[in-house]
Amino acid sequence: MTTIYLDNNATSQVAAEVMDAMLPYFRILYGNPSSMHSFGGQVARKIREAREQAAALIGATPEEVIFTSCGTESDNAAIRSALATHPDRRHILTSRVEHPAVKSLCAHLSRQGYRVTELPVDKDGLLDMNQFERSLTPDTAVVSLMWANNETGALFPVEKAAELAHDKGILFHTDAVQAVGKIPINMKSNVIDMLSISGHKLHAPKGIGILYVRKGTKFSPFLIGGHQEKERRGGTENTPSIIGLGKACELAASNMKMENTRVKKLRDKLETELLERIPNSRVNGTRLYRLPNTTNISFEFVEGEAILLLMDEFGICASSGSACTSGSLQPSHVLRAMGVPFTMAHGSIRFSLSIYNTEEEIDFVIEKLPSIIERLRGLSPYWNLGDQACTVQ
């Protein structure tokens, strides 16, 4: 059975070019980049090249790129550094719809005495910027807002938010894990202090990430150890993955405009056809300010987990929320924050496409999903009691 993979916000296929770039550094050029000998020096030069490739994708300088193990580490390092470099400040400003990497950390820090404000979002998953500005206080050490939501694809105006934070002398961090490689980002044109990237969301391997730290920003290391990453992140470098991430960044920079236009057309076709063919369905979140690859659709009176299981019988892979929380039976915290009705939130499915998806795959999903929803609604007591007459809000 062929797999149709529409869960790319959870993880993505490693590009063939990325794998080819990595392979020599497992068994041939396996030296430690910190070694004095020329064998290690070859590896160090290749890491410098990867750092340049990553910096070019986001309009940064190579010195501003710190390689980490993942987006979660980058988020933790950024927020903890901001608190460590501003010990007199005890307030953190974030949103209710952040990824668990930020949300769970903030909950942990609140138990340690920090005051955390989680800004609400509207029905489209967007922030009220007036409320954001009012929430900035002299005690605020750091603002952490995602650039793009992993469940709905909604884009936050982080560049404007960073300016407002800077006006009050507050550090600004953004979790850009879902945004990098999908939309243009130029750190030279904004004042964001720190930005998180995860390799496996842009066709690099798992276990590698980046923390961008703007030149001049005070930084307190999260992992203490050796001198690696200019003493900003201890630990022997994950050379093959760093090189793979560099190559993935180069590919993303080259292909972004053309491929994302194609991916958006496929996403829009999937969305339009499903809404037309399946009654009592709706898109969750803004349809204007969002990633080109993501749609989150609710099918009322059915369980998202049941939809996923039946789609899986046809080889269709999607998600009922963040891959870091989808093991829970509770509705998505993102959709709850948006005020999505319970009967809709429980039946939400996130489809997230990549450059490797084809129109034939999208047509197959459009063909199969309506009958899956019809079958499940036939088993739903709410649907059978006549609630199907309800109008989707």
Residue ranges of each PLM-predicted region?
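Pyridoxal 5′-phosphate
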Residues: 1-393
